[in-house]
Amino acid sequence: MSMEFDAVIIGGGVSGCATFYTLSEYSSLKRVAIVEKCSKLAQISSSAKANSQTIHDGSIETNYTPEKAKKVRLSAYKTRQYALNKGLQNEVIFETQKMAIGVGDEECEFMKKRYESFKEIFVGLEEFDKQKIKELEPNVILGANGIDRHENIIGHGYRKDWSTMNFAKLSENFVEEALKLKPNNQVFLNFKVKKIEKRNDTYAVISEDAEEVYAKFVLVNAGSYALPLAQSMGYGLDLGCLPVAGSFYFVPDLLRGKVYTVQNPKLPFAAVHGDPDAVIKGKTRIGPTALTMPKLERNKCWLKGISLELLKMDLNKDVFKIAFDLMSDKEIRNYVFKNMVFELPIIGKRKFLKDAQKIIPSLSLEDLEYAHGFGEVRPQVLDRTKRKLELGEKKICTHKGITFNMTPSPGATSCLQNALVDSQEIAAYLGESFELERFYKDLSPEELEN
């Protein structure tokens, strides 16, 4: 079996698998490979346990500006449309209601203004008053005593929307389709990349077991591991990494759909939200928490897996200065300490209950169950030159046949949009064709019309 490929993708999560499919379906590349360190695809950040299983299109994510929401909506549409085109309803993609709520007068005023801006972007977006929310999500309004909560509440959202996705199963489908299209493609599992070497006009991707695959172009979609690989080759040395791990709590099946809350604009992390679990029936997840930890991948044991690569990246004065500046802000400091407490046995559950009751006021301590083994690390990029935290996705384009992607949320939602960008870059670099018009026709006709 030949180990030479036009392109090799490092990382078998949903982003890597989306590019594997996109190159196979729409480009003239002959052979593409994925190398993945786990024994199965999509076992880390794309696992159904690692994320909130949400297609983040911007309609109920209150930290998105209208400008960002317009872009994210188009990205989300591609992912949703792919699943619907392939007939993956109720297997990969699920329909449910969803809403964002404001609790209290200040948040309600914010939500009213937000609705006026966002109803032009999202066709069919409905505004819900307290009574309508009670009809749609009774447990958001009813208190423990059966009496309606006293706070003013307003929201907006959709009564039905294809908003829930199992990104692990989506990853598997991308790969199945790609292998049908190009039988010479290859997937290498249990292939943990040790290093990447440039050899004349090709790259050698070398595993810890001394296996080698070769490619004219390498795309690194390895989540938290992308930046250490980049720095091992001399790229991205001006960047650091702040790994933020999210945890969840289970509660009984008390929500009919997704319920999001207003996010503090100072905080670069999602506000607590409620999501009926698409995989574990009868359970609703509340979360995520946000805990910084010295690890590129989450493990059950606190001391297990502390990352030497991370220490190499972050043990410098610029990163310490960024961390000091962040912690100097009282709201951020309190948020960090509060989330540390959430992880503690016994006391953490008691402290988290108050946050969870913002969504379901009748919740009791007995209703909360820490979701062991759920949640994963999201790499937040630190710019050492600008001395600040960079929110969102980060890409290192070398223009030398290798690109590195760091894709925290909403990276899974945007997987096909990111795959489009990467596939066009790869095809252009290799002198191959890419059928952009057919891509838009299949997955985003709106952009074709514009």
Swiss-Prot record:
Cellular compartments annotated: Cell membrane
GO biological process, alphabetically ordered: tricarboxylic acid cycle
Official protein name in the record: Malate:quinone oxidoreductase
Predominant cellular place of this UniProt entry's protein: membrane
Family the UniProt entry places it in: Belongs to the MQO family.
Membrane disposition: Peripheral membrane protein
Recorded metabolic or biological pathway in which this protein acts: Carbohydrate metabolism; tricarboxylic acid cycle; oxaloacetate from (S)-malate (quinone route): step 1/1
This protein's record includes keyword Endoplasmic reticulum: no
Source organism per UniProt: Helicobacter pylori (strain ATCC 700392 / 26695) (Campylobacter pylori)
UniProt EC number: 1.1.5.4
Family annotation (Pfam families): Mqo
Key words, A-Z: Cell membrane, FAD, Flavoprotein, Membrane, Oxidoreductase, Tricarboxylic acid cycle
Gene Ontology cellular component terms for the protein in this record: cytoplasm; plasma membrane
GO molecular function, one term: L-malate dehydrogenase (quinone) activity
Cofactor or coenzyme needed: FAD
Co-factor remark: The FAD is tightly bound.
Protein encoded by which gene: mqo
Paired cysteines (S-S): none
Coiled-coil ranges per UniProt: none
Function: Catalyzes oxidation of malate to oxaloacetate in the citric acid cycle. Donates electrons to quinones of the electron transfer chain.
InterPro entries registered for this protein in UniProt: FAD/NAD-bd_sf (IPR036188), MQO (IPR006231)
Catalytic function, reaction form: (S)-malate + a quinone = a quinol + oxaloacetate
